[in-house]
Amino acid sequence: MARVKRGVIARARHKKVLKQAKGYYGARSRVYRVAKQAVIKAGQYAYRDRRQRKRQFRALWITRINAGAREFGLSYSRFISGLKKASIEIDRKVLADLAVRDKDAFAELARIAQG
């Protein structure tokens, strides 16, 4: 049986990593050893930030709802509590959108939340 040399496999692996590192600055896009580390780190950041994105958007929505509610003399917590008591189930994403784009609808919700 013939001996298998790994040149083809190594080249393919290197090409794959360098393709993933395309657009990186300097050696990070050209030197395999550096590019591999950069790609691994980028993957870790991407994994972490996919989870953080959910937290950040929720925080943004809450901030917008709070700002909208305070225009009607309500704090965020009292506004949400009032909606729950009135058995209105609108998620924070939609509430934030209403607070920014549809002031009249949000005002109606605030009136309901006040009791």
Swiss-Prot record:
Highest taxon of the lineage: Bacteria
UniProt-recorded Gene Ontology molecular function terms: rRNA binding; structural constituent of ribosome
Tagged with keyword Disulfide bond: no
Pfam families: Ribosomal_L20 (PF00453)
GO cellular component: ribonucleoprotein complex; ribosome
GO biological process, one term: translation
Alphabetically ordered keywords of this record: Ribonucleoprotein, Ribosomal protein, RNA-binding, rRNA-binding
Family: Belongs to the bacterial ribosomal protein bL20 family.
Function: Binds directly to 23S ribosomal RNA and is necessary for the in vitro assembly process of the 50S ribosomal subunit. It is not involved in the protein synthesizing functions of that subunit.
Protein name: Large ribosomal subunit protein bL20
Gene behind this protein: rplT
